[in-house]
Every structure is written in structure tokens, then in C-alpha cells.
Amino acid sequence: MKRKTSERSQNEIHVRKPSNQETIAERKEIQLQDRYKDFAKNLGHDIATIEIEIPGSGIILKPDLVDFTSMEIIEVKSGVTRKYVREAIGQVLDYAFQIKQIENKVYNPVILVPGELSKDLSDLLKELDIKVIYENRNTFLR
């Protein structure tokens, strides 16, 4: 596990050209990540990003945030729909598993989203023992 300084977004949008079609992707996820990072740091938390190199594979995983104070690995998503949550589940569980295998440390999986989840999705995450942090006005709730 290699600790990295998390990037701050300087742009509100960036342009990508998948399949020869120009699209504009808003950087809502990075903005949410930056707001949460500032919030957590104001509470005295040591929060950063890391790189996880999977031994023998050449694959490097890059979780969005790690809170070293609360031992949480955090996947940030810009939406609250099932699609976003399902993707986040796979990512955050993989990160937590890899850290446990490589470092023999247990980091609790957390998903950070821009708003409250539906009861169904909240129940799913509870069943999987994945915590949720969501933004509500100018604060973050669990």
C-alpha cells in the first residue's frame, strides 16, 4: 500500500471522446470528495488516497479516499441510484479485501454519496456491513 496525496480538481468539467462522440462529464464526484475531505480534516481525521498494488499482477487499485483515523476505505459516487451503489459495492469490498490480504489490516468499507439512499439500497449496504456517508446541506451524515 502506497500513500498518495489526493488530487484537487481545478476544473468543473472535463471533456472525453469515447467512441468518437464528444461528451462532457461533470466532476461532481471529485467535488464531493474534496468537500468530504475538508469536512473530515476539520474533525481532525487523517485522510488521503492510496495505491494498492496487487502482488504478481501488475494491477494498481486507486481507492478514492482512506480515513486512517477511523480505519475506513471510502468509495465516492456522484449519484444515489442502484447503478452507482452496485458499482461502489464491488469496488470498496475489493479494496478492503486487498488491503487485508496484503497488509493484514482491516479497513471498514464506506460509500460516500451526494444524498440519502433509498431504504432498499440502505438495507442492502447494511446487510453487507458497508457504511454510508451522505451529504445533507453543508454537512455529512451517516
Question: Where in the sequence are the language-model features?
Answer:
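Acidic-basic catalytic patches of nuclease active cores, encompassing PD-(D/E)XK
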Residues: 5-52
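Conserved catalytic cores of phosphodiester-cleaving nucleases, focusing on short active-site segments
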Residues: 36, 65-78
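An acidic intrinsically disordered interaction segment
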Residues: 46-69, 126-128
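Nucleic-acid nuclease catalytic cores
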Residues: 78, 97-132
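Active-site-adjacent loop/helix micro-motif of nuclease/hydrolase catalytic cores
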Residues: 81-91, 120
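Short, well-ordered amphipathic alpha-helices
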Residues: 90-98
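Charged, structured surface patches that assemble and position nucleic-acid processing machinery
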Residues: 129-141
